[in-house]
A protein has these predicted regions:
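Surface-exposed, secretory/extracytoplasmic low-complexity segments enriched in Ser/Thr/Asn/Gly/Pro
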Residues: 1-302, 307, 354-356, 361-364
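Active-site scaffold segments
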Residues: 307-353, 358-362
Protein backbone atom coordinates (compact mmCIF):
# COMPACT_ATOMS: atom_id res chain seq x y z
CA UNK A 1 0.00 0.00 0.00
CA UNK A 2 1.40 3.43 -0.93
CA UNK A 3 1.60 6.20 1.76
CA UNK A 4 0.86 9.43 -0.10
CA UNK A 5 2.22 11.62 2.72
CA UNK A 6 5.56 10.03 3.34
CA UNK A 7 5.99 8.21 0.01
CA UNK A 8 6.56 4.78 1.71
CA UNK A 9 5.22 1.31 0.66
CA UNK A 10 4.14 -1.60 2.90
CA UNK A 11 3.10 -5.16 2.11
CA UNK A 12 0.03 -6.60 3.89
CA UNK A 13 -0.29 -10.37 4.38
CA UNK A 14 -3.84 -11.62 4.72
CA UNK A 15 -4.71 -13.77 7.69
CA UNK A 16 -6.68 -16.93 6.82
CA UNK A 17 -8.95 -18.41 9.44
CA UNK A 18 -10.33 -21.89 8.73
CA UNK A 19 -13.76 -22.98 9.90
CA UNK A 20 -12.67 -26.50 10.79
CA UNK A 21 -16.21 -27.82 11.26
CA UNK A 22 -17.31 -26.53 7.85
CA UNK A 23 -14.17 -27.94 6.25
CA UNK A 24 -14.79 -31.29 7.93
CA UNK A 25 -18.35 -31.43 6.57
CA UNK A 26 -17.13 -30.60 3.08
CA UNK A 27 -14.34 -33.17 3.37
CA UNK A 28 -16.66 -35.94 4.56
CA UNK A 29 -18.92 -35.34 1.57
CA UNK A 30 -16.13 -35.93 -0.95
CA UNK A 31 -16.66 -39.03 -3.08
CA UNK A 32 -13.22 -40.54 -2.47
CA UNK A 33 -13.66 -40.09 1.30
CA UNK A 34 -17.02 -41.87 1.31
CA UNK A 35 -15.57 -44.63 -0.87
CA UNK A 36 -12.60 -45.06 1.44
CA UNK A 37 -14.85 -45.26 4.50
CA UNK A 38 -16.74 -48.20 2.97
CA UNK A 39 -13.77 -49.85 1.34
CA UNK A 40 -12.78 -53.39 2.27
CA UNK A 41 -9.57 -52.99 4.24
CA UNK A 42 -8.26 -56.50 3.68
CA UNK A 43 -7.71 -59.04 0.93
CA UNK A 44 -10.91 -60.78 -0.14
CA UNK A 45 -11.46 -63.75 -2.42
CA UNK A 46 -14.97 -64.79 -3.37
CA UNK A 47 -17.24 -65.62 -6.30
CA UNK A 48 -19.01 -62.67 -7.88
CA UNK A 49 -22.51 -62.53 -9.37
CA UNK A 50 -21.31 -64.22 -12.57
CA UNK A 51 -19.97 -67.15 -10.55
CA UNK A 52 -16.24 -66.71 -11.08
CA UNK A 53 -13.72 -66.01 -8.35
CA UNK A 54 -12.48 -62.42 -8.01
CA UNK A 55 -9.75 -61.04 -5.79
CA UNK A 56 -10.02 -57.64 -4.11
CA UNK A 57 -6.89 -55.97 -2.77
CA UNK A 58 -8.09 -53.80 0.08
CA UNK A 59 -4.55 -53.08 1.26
CA UNK A 60 -3.22 -51.27 -1.77
CA UNK A 61 -3.96 -47.57 -2.03
CA UNK A 62 -5.50 -47.24 1.43
CA UNK A 63 -5.75 -43.62 2.54
CA UNK A 64 -5.18 -42.41 6.11
CA UNK A 65 -8.30 -40.24 6.14
CA UNK A 66 -7.39 -38.31 9.29
CA UNK A 67 -3.94 -37.54 7.98
CA UNK A 68 -5.44 -36.47 4.68
CA UNK A 69 -7.84 -34.11 6.47
CA UNK A 70 -5.02 -32.46 8.41
CA UNK A 71 -3.09 -32.05 5.17
CA UNK A 72 -6.15 -30.46 3.60
CA UNK A 73 -6.57 -28.09 6.53
CA UNK A 74 -2.93 -27.03 6.24
CA UNK A 75 -3.31 -26.55 2.49
CA UNK A 76 -6.29 -24.24 2.95
CA UNK A 77 -4.59 -22.26 5.70
CA UNK A 78 -1.61 -21.67 3.42
CA UNK A 79 -3.86 -20.48 0.63
CA UNK A 80 -2.87 -23.31 -1.68
CA UNK A 81 -5.25 -24.70 -4.29
CA UNK A 82 -4.03 -28.27 -4.72
CA UNK A 83 -3.09 -31.15 -2.46
CA UNK A 84 -1.12 -34.24 -3.50
CA UNK A 85 -2.03 -37.04 -1.09
CA UNK A 86 0.97 -39.14 -2.06
CA UNK A 87 3.47 -36.32 -1.54
CA UNK A 88 1.81 -35.56 1.78
CA UNK A 89 2.32 -39.15 2.98
CA UNK A 90 -1.40 -39.86 3.29
CA UNK A 91 -1.27 -43.47 2.03
CA UNK A 92 -0.76 -46.39 4.39
CA UNK A 93 2.30 -48.53 3.79
CA UNK A 94 0.98 -51.97 4.69
CA UNK A 95 2.90 -55.24 4.63
CA UNK A 96 0.59 -58.27 4.19
CA UNK A 97 0.59 -60.77 7.02
CA UNK A 98 1.06 -64.51 6.47
CA UNK A 99 -2.66 -65.24 6.11
CA UNK A 100 -2.99 -62.48 3.56
CA UNK A 101 0.01 -63.76 1.63
CA UNK A 102 -1.52 -67.25 1.59
CA UNK A 103 -4.80 -65.87 0.25
CA UNK A 104 -3.01 -63.90 -2.45
CA UNK A 105 -1.06 -66.98 -3.54
CA UNK A 106 -4.28 -68.99 -3.65
CA UNK A 107 -5.77 -66.34 -5.91
CA UNK A 108 -2.86 -66.67 -8.33
CA UNK A 109 -3.60 -70.39 -8.65
CA UNK A 110 -7.33 -69.79 -9.07
CA UNK A 111 -6.68 -67.10 -11.67
CA UNK A 112 -4.57 -69.50 -13.70
CA UNK A 113 -7.13 -72.29 -13.35
CA UNK A 114 -10.05 -70.05 -14.35
CA UNK A 115 -8.30 -68.94 -17.54
CA UNK A 116 -9.37 -72.15 -19.26
CA UNK A 117 -8.71 -72.37 -23.01
CA UNK A 118 -11.15 -75.20 -23.85
CA UNK A 119 -13.71 -74.20 -26.47
CA UNK A 120 -16.34 -76.77 -27.46
CA UNK A 121 -17.08 -76.96 -31.20
CA UNK A 122 -20.61 -77.89 -32.26
CA UNK A 123 -20.49 -77.45 -36.02
CA UNK A 124 -20.01 -73.73 -36.62
CA UNK A 125 -21.03 -72.88 -33.05
CA UNK A 126 -18.43 -72.28 -30.35
CA UNK A 127 -19.07 -72.81 -26.64
CA UNK A 128 -16.16 -71.80 -24.36
CA UNK A 129 -15.67 -73.21 -20.88
CA UNK A 130 -15.81 -69.94 -18.93
CA UNK A 131 -14.15 -68.82 -15.71
CA UNK A 132 -17.51 -69.14 -13.96
CA UNK A 133 -17.86 -72.70 -15.27
CA UNK A 134 -14.40 -73.57 -13.95
CA UNK A 135 -15.24 -72.09 -10.55
CA UNK A 136 -18.42 -74.15 -10.36
CA UNK A 137 -16.43 -77.38 -10.81
CA UNK A 138 -14.36 -76.90 -7.64
CA UNK A 139 -14.92 -78.62 -4.33
CA UNK A 140 -15.00 -75.82 -1.75
CA UNK A 141 -14.88 -75.31 1.99
CA UNK A 142 -16.02 -72.03 3.51
CA UNK A 143 -16.33 -70.66 0.00
CA UNK A 144 -12.74 -71.38 -1.04
CA UNK A 145 -11.35 -74.22 -3.20
CA UNK A 146 -10.06 -77.37 -1.52
CA UNK A 147 -6.65 -78.73 -2.54
CA UNK A 148 -5.34 -82.27 -2.31
CA UNK A 149 -2.05 -83.45 -0.83
CA UNK A 150 -0.17 -82.47 -3.99
CA UNK A 151 -1.60 -78.95 -3.94
CA UNK A 152 -3.99 -79.46 -6.86
CA UNK A 153 -7.58 -78.31 -6.72
CA UNK A 154 -10.18 -81.01 -6.14
CA UNK A 155 -12.89 -81.21 -8.82
CA UNK A 156 -16.52 -82.00 -8.10
CA UNK A 157 -17.34 -84.76 -10.57
CA UNK A 158 -21.08 -84.31 -10.04
CA UNK A 159 -20.79 -80.65 -11.03
CA UNK A 160 -18.78 -81.54 -14.14
CA UNK A 161 -21.33 -84.23 -15.03
CA UNK A 162 -24.16 -81.72 -14.66
CA UNK A 163 -22.32 -79.27 -16.93
CA UNK A 164 -21.92 -81.89 -19.64
CA UNK A 165 -25.60 -82.73 -19.23
CA UNK A 166 -26.44 -79.09 -19.92
CA UNK A 167 -24.33 -79.20 -23.08
CA UNK A 168 -26.22 -82.30 -24.21
CA UNK A 169 -29.57 -80.68 -23.47
CA UNK A 170 -28.55 -77.66 -25.52
CA UNK A 171 -26.92 -79.37 -28.50
CA UNK A 172 -28.16 -82.97 -28.76
CA UNK A 173 -30.34 -83.39 -31.83
CA UNK A 174 -31.45 -86.98 -31.34
CA UNK A 175 -35.03 -87.13 -30.09
CA UNK A 176 -35.40 -83.35 -30.18
CA UNK A 177 -38.59 -81.55 -31.17
CA UNK A 178 -37.69 -79.26 -34.06
CA UNK A 179 -39.15 -76.21 -35.75
CA UNK A 180 -38.76 -76.55 -39.52
CA UNK A 181 -39.36 -73.90 -42.18
CA UNK A 182 -41.12 -75.83 -44.93
CA UNK A 183 -41.00 -75.12 -48.64
CA UNK A 184 -44.75 -74.47 -48.59
CA UNK A 185 -44.06 -71.51 -46.32
CA UNK A 186 -45.13 -72.42 -42.80
CA UNK A 187 -43.18 -73.49 -39.74
CA UNK A 188 -43.73 -77.15 -38.87
CA UNK A 189 -43.21 -78.69 -35.43
CA UNK A 190 -41.73 -82.15 -35.88
CA UNK A 191 -41.17 -84.71 -33.14
CA UNK A 192 -39.28 -87.97 -33.21
CA UNK A 193 -37.18 -89.62 -35.87
CA UNK A 194 -33.80 -91.28 -36.02
CA UNK A 195 -31.70 -88.26 -36.98
CA UNK A 196 -29.53 -86.22 -34.68
CA UNK A 197 -26.33 -86.28 -32.70
CA UNK A 198 -26.09 -87.50 -29.13
CA UNK A 199 -23.21 -86.47 -26.91
CA UNK A 200 -21.27 -89.21 -25.14
CA UNK A 201 -21.70 -87.67 -21.71
CA UNK A 202 -19.53 -90.17 -19.85
CA UNK A 203 -16.57 -89.60 -22.15
CA UNK A 204 -16.98 -85.82 -22.09
CA UNK A 205 -17.14 -85.81 -18.30
CA UNK A 206 -13.96 -87.89 -18.21
CA UNK A 207 -12.32 -85.51 -20.70
CA UNK A 208 -13.02 -82.46 -18.56
CA UNK A 209 -12.03 -84.20 -15.32
CA UNK A 210 -8.70 -85.09 -16.93
CA UNK A 211 -7.95 -81.80 -18.67
CA UNK A 212 -9.31 -79.04 -16.43
CA UNK A 213 -6.28 -79.22 -14.15
CA UNK A 214 -3.83 -79.69 -17.01
CA UNK A 215 -1.53 -76.68 -17.37
CA UNK A 216 -1.75 -77.13 -21.12
CA UNK A 217 -5.30 -75.76 -21.24
CA UNK A 218 -4.44 -72.62 -19.30
CA UNK A 219 -1.96 -70.99 -21.67
CA UNK A 220 -4.10 -68.13 -22.97
CA UNK A 221 -4.52 -69.71 -26.41
CA UNK A 222 -7.96 -71.11 -27.23
CA UNK A 223 -8.04 -74.85 -27.87
CA UNK A 224 -10.91 -76.16 -29.96
CA UNK A 225 -12.42 -79.40 -28.73
CA UNK A 226 -14.75 -81.52 -30.86
CA UNK A 227 -16.72 -83.70 -28.43
CA UNK A 228 -17.22 -87.43 -28.62
CA UNK A 229 -20.68 -88.61 -29.68
CA UNK A 230 -22.73 -91.73 -29.12
CA UNK A 231 -24.59 -90.88 -32.31
CA UNK A 232 -23.18 -88.85 -35.19
CA UNK A 233 -25.12 -86.46 -37.41
CA UNK A 234 -24.72 -84.90 -40.85
CA UNK A 235 -24.51 -81.45 -39.23
CA UNK A 236 -23.89 -80.27 -35.68
CA UNK A 237 -25.15 -77.39 -33.58
CA UNK A 238 -28.65 -76.37 -32.65
CA UNK A 239 -29.64 -76.15 -36.33
CA UNK A 240 -28.44 -79.64 -37.15
CA UNK A 241 -30.59 -80.10 -40.25
CA UNK A 242 -28.44 -77.52 -41.96
CA UNK A 243 -28.91 -76.52 -45.59
CA UNK A 244 -28.57 -79.95 -47.24
CA UNK A 245 -31.57 -82.22 -46.71
CA UNK A 246 -34.52 -84.08 -48.22
CA UNK A 247 -37.96 -82.69 -47.43
CA UNK A 248 -41.06 -84.88 -47.77
CA UNK A 249 -44.32 -82.93 -47.49
CA UNK A 250 -46.88 -85.71 -47.12
CA UNK A 251 -49.88 -83.40 -47.14
CA UNK A 252 -48.94 -81.94 -50.51
CA UNK A 253 -47.32 -85.22 -51.65
CA UNK A 254 -44.16 -83.39 -52.65
CA UNK A 255 -40.49 -84.21 -52.15
CA UNK A 256 -37.63 -81.70 -52.37
CA UNK A 257 -33.89 -82.06 -52.18
CA UNK A 258 -31.83 -79.05 -51.09
CA UNK A 259 -28.06 -78.99 -51.36
CA UNK A 260 -26.21 -76.14 -49.65
CA UNK A 261 -29.44 -74.18 -49.63
CA UNK A 262 -30.13 -74.64 -53.35
CA UNK A 263 -33.21 -76.56 -54.53
CA UNK A 264 -31.80 -79.39 -56.66
CA UNK A 265 -34.87 -81.58 -57.07
CA UNK A 266 -38.65 -81.29 -56.78
CA UNK A 267 -41.10 -84.08 -57.52
CA UNK A 268 -44.56 -85.47 -56.82
CA UNK A 269 -44.57 -88.63 -54.71
CA UNK A 270 -46.96 -91.16 -53.20
CA UNK A 271 -46.59 -91.97 -49.50
CA UNK A 272 -48.21 -94.54 -47.19
CA UNK A 273 -51.84 -95.61 -47.60
CA UNK A 274 -53.88 -93.68 -45.06
CA UNK A 275 -57.07 -95.76 -45.43
CA UNK A 276 -55.16 -98.94 -44.58
CA UNK A 277 -53.39 -97.20 -41.70
CA UNK A 278 -50.02 -97.47 -43.39
CA UNK A 279 -49.35 -93.75 -43.38
CA UNK A 280 -45.70 -92.78 -43.62
CA UNK A 281 -44.60 -91.68 -40.14
CA UNK A 282 -43.51 -88.13 -39.40
CA UNK A 283 -40.07 -87.38 -38.04
CA UNK A 284 -36.59 -86.22 -38.90
CA UNK A 285 -34.71 -89.27 -40.15
CA UNK A 286 -31.63 -89.76 -42.30
CA UNK A 287 -30.35 -91.69 -45.30
CA UNK A 288 -28.61 -94.67 -43.74
CA UNK A 289 -27.90 -96.68 -46.90
CA UNK A 290 -28.12 -96.67 -50.70
CA UNK A 291 -28.73 -99.73 -52.88
CA UNK A 292 -29.51 -100.49 -56.50
CA UNK A 293 -31.66 -103.29 -57.92
CA UNK A 294 -33.25 -104.29 -54.66
CA UNK A 295 -36.40 -106.39 -54.10
CA UNK A 296 -38.51 -104.96 -51.30
CA UNK A 297 -40.43 -107.67 -49.49
CA UNK A 298 -43.24 -107.62 -46.99
CA UNK A 299 -46.43 -109.49 -46.10
CA UNK A 300 -48.00 -110.38 -49.44
CA UNK A 301 -45.68 -108.43 -51.74
CA UNK A 302 -42.25 -108.42 -53.39
CA UNK A 303 -41.49 -105.22 -55.29
CA UNK A 304 -38.33 -104.88 -57.41
CA UNK A 305 -36.89 -101.37 -57.47
CA UNK A 306 -33.93 -99.82 -59.27
CA UNK A 307 -32.99 -97.34 -56.54
CA UNK A 308 -33.45 -97.83 -52.81
CA UNK A 309 -32.68 -95.15 -50.22
CA UNK A 310 -33.79 -96.34 -46.74
CA UNK A 311 -34.38 -93.66 -44.10
CA UNK A 312 -36.01 -95.37 -41.12
CA UNK A 313 -36.09 -99.13 -40.64
CA UNK A 314 -37.94 -100.61 -43.63
CA UNK A 315 -39.24 -97.23 -44.74
CA UNK A 316 -37.37 -95.56 -47.55
CA UNK A 317 -37.49 -93.66 -50.81
CA UNK A 318 -37.59 -95.66 -54.05
CA UNK A 319 -38.82 -95.72 -57.62
CA UNK A 320 -42.18 -97.36 -58.33
CA UNK A 321 -42.40 -98.57 -61.93
CA UNK A 322 -45.90 -99.95 -61.30
CA UNK A 323 -47.29 -96.45 -60.83
CA UNK A 324 -48.29 -94.20 -63.70
CA UNK A 325 -49.28 -91.20 -61.58
CA UNK A 326 -47.86 -89.49 -58.50
CA UNK A 327 -49.01 -86.72 -56.21
CA UNK A 328 -52.53 -85.52 -55.46
CA UNK A 329 -54.57 -87.60 -53.04
CA UNK A 330 -53.56 -91.04 -54.30
CA UNK A 331 -51.98 -91.80 -50.93
CA UNK A 332 -55.33 -91.54 -49.17
CA UNK A 333 -56.70 -94.77 -50.67
CA UNK A 334 -54.02 -96.27 -52.91
CA UNK A 335 -50.82 -95.33 -51.17
CA UNK A 336 -47.74 -97.39 -50.45
CA UNK A 337 -46.97 -99.72 -47.55
CA UNK A 338 -45.24 -96.75 -45.91
CA UNK A 339 -42.40 -95.91 -48.30
CA UNK A 340 -42.08 -92.80 -50.46
CA UNK A 341 -42.83 -93.88 -54.02
CA UNK A 342 -41.01 -91.67 -56.53
CA UNK A 343 -40.92 -91.40 -60.34
CA UNK A 344 -37.96 -93.39 -61.69
CA UNK A 345 -36.23 -90.49 -63.44
CA UNK A 346 -36.42 -88.32 -60.32
CA UNK A 347 -35.34 -91.20 -58.11
CA UNK A 348 -32.25 -91.75 -60.25
CA UNK A 349 -31.36 -88.06 -59.93
CA UNK A 350 -31.81 -88.15 -56.18
CA UNK A 351 -29.82 -91.36 -55.81
CA UNK A 352 -26.86 -89.86 -57.65
CA UNK A 353 -26.88 -86.64 -55.60
CA UNK A 354 -27.73 -87.59 -52.04
CA UNK A 355 -25.12 -88.75 -49.53
CA UNK A 356 -25.50 -91.28 -46.75
CA UNK A 357 -26.23 -89.37 -43.54
CA UNK A 358 -28.35 -86.67 -45.20
CA UNK A 359 -31.31 -85.58 -43.01
CA UNK A 360 -34.78 -86.47 -44.26
CA UNK A 361 -37.55 -84.23 -42.91
CA UNK A 362 -40.95 -85.94 -43.11
CA UNK A 363 -44.20 -84.24 -42.10
CA UNK A 364 -47.88 -83.70 -42.91
Amino acid sequence: MDNVLFHSRRELSPTVTVDVDALRRAYDSLEFVRAEQHKNKDYSLARDTSGEYVFTDGLAGRIDLEKAFLALENTVENGQETLNLSDSGCYYDITPNENQKTLRNLWKEIERYQSCDIVYCFGQERYPVTAADCASFLVTENGLPVTDQTGNFVLDEEAVTAYVGQLAEKYDGYGRTRQFHSTRGDVITIEGGTYGSKLDQKKETAYLMEHLLDAGVHTGTQQSHVPTYEREAFCYGRDDIGDTYIEVDMTQQKMYYYEKGELRLETDVVTGNMRRRMGTPEGVNFVYNKQKDRVLRGPGYASPVKFWVPVKGSIGIHDASWRKEFGGDIYQTAGSHGCINTPKDKMEELYDMVQIGTPVVMFY
